[in-house]
A protein has these predicted regions:
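Extracytoplasmic/lumenal acceptor-recognition loop(s) of multi-pass membrane glycoenzymes
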Residues: 1-23, 27-34, 74, 88-96, ...
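Residue-level signal for well-ordered alpha-helical segments
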Residues: 2-3, 45, 114
């Protein structure tokens, strides 16, 4: 966010994509515009930086809040139809030039914050959660351990396609 608001990129959406962020809300008033509230307008530089973003599109909303949709969004649990390099994408500059919009949502049956299920294909599964070695992906009776991705998130290398479960084991 800091890089985007500084004016150093016009692709802030790509920087937010690995976090699974689809919408950005900029609130400038404590209540809707038709009622009394406290104004807290954003600065001109911030307004210009947000307005220059190529992948953050404004939605029609109340004047008290600006909602931007991230056109570079990807699901927080995703696989990619075309090859995308997920290893070594640790620097913001690398993310800005990497298109993650081909991400296909997987593991969409959310049982809890610690368990999701669904179909996955063979290949890398990206999970937009802070890397934690206690996460597991179970597919075809095989348990897969996480690898770091984006310098903070996780990826799992699924050996096969099929029903899968992503779950977290509490440490002892």
């Amino acid at each position: 966010v800091e890089i985007g608001l500084s004016g150093n990129t016009t692709r802030m959406g790509r920087l937010l994509a690995p976090f699974g962020i689809r919408y950005v809300a900029v609130v400038e008033r404590s209540t809707p515009s038709f009622s009394d509230g406290f104004d807290r307008p954003i600065g001109l530089r911030t307004r210009q930086a947000l307005g220059s973003q190529l992948d953050l599109r404004p939605l029609a909303t109340d004047p008290s809040v600006t909602v931007l949709v991230n056109e570079s969004w990807m699901s927080s649990r995703a696989q990619f139809g075309s090859p995308v390099r997920l290893v070594g994408l640790d620097e913001p500059g690398e993310l800005v030039v990497t298109d993650l919009t081909s991400g296909i949502p997987v593991l969409t049956d959310r049982r809890s914050s610690r368990e999701q299920r669904g179909f996955v294909g063979a290949g890398e599964v990206l999970v937009a959660e802070a890397y934690d070695p206690n996460w597991r992906l179970l597919i075809g009776g095989e348990t897969i351990f996480p690898e770091p991705s984006f310098g903070w998130a996780m990826r799992f290398d699924s050996p096969t396609s099929g029903r899968a479960a992503l779950f977290h084991i509490r440490p002892d």
